[in-house]
């Protein structure tokens, strides 16, 4: 599998966190809460062996931030 993509995007009534591989999205009242949830999700997935990337989009549509969470390296 490749990198799991997680997006934080503005909505009319809050901020959404969505993933390419999941149909349902989560909605938060603030961008900060959505970003925090997305980063925690990405870290959990990475710890489970699924590298993830979070992309945070601003209200105007511009990319506001990009974060990578890599899977831990296997010990030799």
Model feature map: region roles:
Residues 1-25:
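Short aromatic-glycine-(Arg/Gly/Cys) micro-motifs in beta-strand/loop hairpins
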Residues 8, 17, 28, 42, ...:
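Conserved short hydrophobic patches within well-ordered secondary structure
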Residues 20, 30, 68:
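Surface loops and adjacent helix of pleckstrin homology
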Residues 23-28, 62-65:
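Surface-exposed loop/edge segments in extracytoplasmic proteins
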Residues 23-26, 34, 71:
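Short, surface-exposed beta-strand-loop junctions and turns on beta-sheet-rich folds
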Residues 27-30, 76:
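A short, polar/proline- and glycine-enriched secondary-structure boundary/capping micro-motif
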Residues 29-51:
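A short, charged, amphipathic alpha-helix used as a generic interaction element across diverse proteins
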Residues 46-76:
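Short, mixed-charge low-complexity intrinsically disordered segments
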């Amino acid at each position: 599998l490749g990198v799991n993509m997680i997006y934080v995007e503005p909505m009319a009534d809050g901020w959404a966190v969505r993933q390419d591989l999941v149909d349902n999205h989560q909605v938060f009242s603030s961008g900060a809460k959505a970003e925090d949830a997305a980063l925690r999700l990405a870290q959990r997935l990475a710890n489970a062996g699924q590298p993830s990337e979070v992309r945070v989009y601003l209200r105007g549509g511009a990319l506001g931030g990009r974060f990578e969470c890599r899977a831990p390296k296997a010990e030799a």
